[in-house]
Amino acid sequence: MKVDFSRGQWDNAPLTYAYSFRFQETPVFAQEDDCIVNRKNDAFEQGFDNVTLMAEQPCAAGAAISATCSFEAYGAPLFVIAEKLHRCPDGTLRYGDYLEVVLYENGVNVWRMKMTDGKVRWVKLLGAEFPVTAGERHAFSARVTKTGLVIETCGRKFTLYVEDMYPSFYLGVSACEQINRFYDMEITEE
């Protein structure tokens, strides 16, 4: 599945909004001519909308997600790899056990998020430090294997072992912290 996020180009894409159980808000991306973008939102605890678009169908080991993205200072465009999507009574889709593969000014972080006692808790699995320029477009990808992740961006490649990797999962893009733009997204399966 390849999606161009330009205006009018992704209206029928098999994507759905989904949200972490960490947050109550359910914002959507704003449309710009050549991309989608999250917005400043003073009502949100971080001051910006935290928005995720997920593929509607689950994937298995061998699947990869890639995107062209950019971010303003302190932004954090990321991939979400969610074990399950839960339909809440209000119809909203949410996820609680998931991985975040985050691109930001100081490199790449990977976080494992787990729902415990009704709260999402997290642990950092990877902190690879290198400069990533805000305001520029970056190609970013993550392949899910049976035992972890292979991440590529900015001419660098990282292989990360992830204990108890999900046998099936949902993939998506998410805008977190500050302003983030996604120009395209592709999900491939082996």
Task: Please provide the spans of the model-predicted regions.
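Secretory/extracellular carbohydrate-interaction modules
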Residues: 40-114
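Low-complexity, Ser/Thr/Pro/Gly-rich disordered linker/stalk regions
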Residues: 1-63, 148
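Beta-strand-rich interaction surfaces with strong enrichment in secreted/lumenal proteins
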Residues: 51-58, 126-132, 160, 171-172
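Generic beta-strand structural signal
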Residues: 30-31, 103-104, 144-146
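Short, aromatic/His-centered strand-loop micro-motif at the edge of beta-sheets
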Residues: 116-139
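Extracellular beta-strand elements of beta-rich domains used
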Residues: 5, 142, 183-187
